[in-house]
From Swiss-Prot:
This is Kappa-theraphotoxin-Cg1a 3. The keyword Nucleotide-binding does not apply. The keyword Transcription regulation does not apply. GO terms for cellular component: extracellular region.
Length: 86
C-alpha cells in the first residue's frame, strides 16, 4: 500500500513538472511576465542597507550581527551568544 502511494505521488509530481515546463515553453519566460511590483521589491531589497543581521542571518564577523548574537565561525550565521540584558 505504501509503495503504491509513493508511486502515485511520484507520477503526479512528474506530471506537474511536465505541465509546468510545457506551459512555460508556450508562454515564454520573458521578464515582462513578472509583475511590476515584484521588480520594484527586488530593487528595494538590493539597495536597502541593513544595520545588523538577525538570527540565522549570514555574517563574517560578530559586529555584523545584532545585539546578543554572535557570528558562528563554522557556518557563518548569526546565533545567540548566551548573553542577556539590554
Amino acid at each position: 500500500m505504501k509503495v503504491s502511494v509513493l508511486i502515485t505521488l511520484a507520477v503526479l509530481g512528474v506530471m506537474f513538472v511536465w505541465a509546468s515546463a510545457a506551459e512555460l515553453e508556450e508562454r515564454g519566460s520573458d521578464q515582462r511576465d513578472s509583475p511590476a511590483w515584484l521588480k520594484s521589491m527586488e530593487r528595494i531589497f538590493r539597495s536597502e542597507e541593513r544595520e545588523c543581521r538577525k538570527m540565522f542571518g549570514g555574517c563574517s564577523v560578530d559586529s555584523d550581527c545584532c545585539a546578543h548574537l554572535g557570528c558562528k565561525p563554522t557556518l557563518k550565521y548569526c546565533a545567540w551568544d548566551g548573553t542577556f540584558g539590554k
